[in-house]
Amino acid sequence: AGAQAMLERTVQYARDRSVFGKPLLAKQDVQFTLAELQTEIELLRQLNYHCVRMYVAQEECTRETSMAKLAAGRLVRKVADWCLQFHGGYGY
């Protein structure tokens, strides 16, 4: 939820922020990076849903939940770092 919120705010900022007369979001490298981050968030969300399904079905899910926990921490740091970069001086 936190990574998704950060990314949504950054996308809105990139739409509003103009660089050399064009929105920051018009830059292809920005689009690719934001798409990659959104893809990773969605992949982690699906892994979490998979863990919940396993837990509800009373299946062993220790390995999957450990993977999700590790990936979540890394992804939040990665998204926060990229969002900070896109916000530039306003990120602080």
Which sequence ranges carry the predicted segments?
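Alpha-helical interface subdomain recognition
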Residues: 1-92
